[in-house]
């Protein structure tokens, strides 16, 4: 029981640490917005902050996976030792000349408590991956405009006289179009019929930034965000 209690305490502390990091991320973001004098802030700075938060969130998810894996290994070890002990006792009862006396009431209570603890740990560990996967999926479905800094990395020979706002307008329209996962690649003519602000410079720029894919037929597909 002492080992199980220590194990539960370790997992509870890990969960508390995760909650603290999450609250700290929210607090830092709100504090940064207040220092800028507005909750909207500078769009470029907000995008940079969002990238930093996503990176910290990814690190946090990795820690959660490690904790869940360690929790599962601990439960498997406890269950294996318990099964081995029960088998040894049964083997002794079957082979020894002297029958092992039945468990006392106190021993039975200790055994039942240990089994209950293992079962409780198993129930708590199972849903860990579902909210984490959901959070990662939601993070991947968030649209981000191309920042001015990123835009400047595209050679002038590729982007020509393209303006950043026109590039982001087309990128957002494509993102919204492909939010329906059942939609396949789209042609330039189809984009024009949908009133998208499409032009060769914008498509080449998005392709250069690895945000879209152009096949040999000129059909456009949106690449998944990292």
From Swiss-Prot:
Record CDD domains: SKA2 (cd12955)
Per the record, its GO cellular-component terms are: cytoplasm; meiotic spindle; outer kinetochore; spindle microtubule
The superkingdom of the source organism is Eukaryota
Q: Which keywords, in A-to-Z order, does the entry hold?
A: Cell cycle, Cell division, Centromere, Chromosome, Cytoplasm, Cytoskeleton, Kinetochore, Microtubule, Mitosis
Q: Which GO terms describe its molecular function?
A: microtubule binding
Q: Which GO terms describe its biological process?
A: attachment of mitotic spindle microtubules to kinetochore; cell division; chromosome segregation; mitotic cell cycle; mitotic metaphase chromosome alignment; mitotic sister chromatid segregation; regulation of microtubule polymerization or depolymerization
Entry-linked InterPro entries: Ska2, Ska2_N
Q: Which family is it part of?
A: Belongs to the SKA2 family.
Free-text function comment from the UniProt entry? Component of the SKA complex, a microtubule plus end-binding complex of the outer kinetochore that stabilizes spindle microtubule-kinetochore attachments, promotes alignment of chromosomes at the mitotic spindle equator (chromosome congression) and assists suppression of the spindle assembly checkpoint. Kinetochores, consisting of a centromere-associated inner segment and a microtubule-contacting outer segment, play a crucial role in chromosome segregation by mediating the physical connection between centromeric DNA and spindle microtubules.
This chain belongs to which protein, by name? Answer: SKA complex subunit 2
Gene of origin? ska2
């Amino acid at each position: 029981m002492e080992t199980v209690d220590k194990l539960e305490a370790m997992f509870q502390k890990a969960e508390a640490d995760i909650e603290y990091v999450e609250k700290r991320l929210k607090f830092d973001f709100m504090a940064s917005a207040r220092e800028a004098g507005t909750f909207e802030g500078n769009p470029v700075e907000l995008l940079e902050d969002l990238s930093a938060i996503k990176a910290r969130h990814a690190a946090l998810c990795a820690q959660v996976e490690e904790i869940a894996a360690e929790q599962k290994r601990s439960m498997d070890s406890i269950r294996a030792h318990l099964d081995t002990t029960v088998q040894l006792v049964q083997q002794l009862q079957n082979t020894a000349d002297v029958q092992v006396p039945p468990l006392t009431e106190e021993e039975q209570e200790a055994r039942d408590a240990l089994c209950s603890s293992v079962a409780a740990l198993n129930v708590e560990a199972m849903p860990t991956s579902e909210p984490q996967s959901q959070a990662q999926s939601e993070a991947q479905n968030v649209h981000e405009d191309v920042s001015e800094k990123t835009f400047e990395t595209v050679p002038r020979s590729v982007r020509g006289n393209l303006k950043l706002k026109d590039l982001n307008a087309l990128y957002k329209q494509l993102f919204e179009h492909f939010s329906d996962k059942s939609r396949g690649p789209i042609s330039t003519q189809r984009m024009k019929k949908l009133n998208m602000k499409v032009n060769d410079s914008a498509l080449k720029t998005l392709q250069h930034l690895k945000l879209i894919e152009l096949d040999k037929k000129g059909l456009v597909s949106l690449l998944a965000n990292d």
